[in-house]
Amino acid sequence: MIYLDTSAVAKLVVEEAESSALAQWVDDRSDDVLCTSALTRMELLRAASRRSPDTVPAALAILAQLAIVPLDDLVLEGAATASPTTLRSLDAIHLASATSLLPDRGTVVSYDQRLLDAARGVGLEAVMPGAHD
């Protein structure tokens, strides 16, 4: 399984510097299940609406291809106790969402270094495709 946070999913909707590298990275792993948090739906749709209402359909199309982790009590409790304590609240929710699906294996894709460091800290592979090319 591959967990994409909002910063990664957004690059699949709006062309940014790392978008093509990320799209290729995802295509190369077409047998893997892609997932994200219900939080991403809210963050992505708000960002798409703010950028341009024309991007909302593309955002919805990408979200439809992802398995969505619900924001349930397990995820919220995991976020409340996530380490390091310096991790921002929304990033802690992403980390808890990822670990609820990927307890000891899997990959987190993000363009937030603090989240990637925290994911590595709990034993997950953490990648930022195209960021260091």
Where are these regions (language model features)?
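Acidic, PIN/NYN-like endoribonuclease modules and their adjacent C-terminal/linker elements
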Residues: 1, 37, 41, 69, ...
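Phosphate- and divalent-cation-binding pockets in alpha/beta enzyme and binding domains
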Residues: 21, 43, 78, 117-118
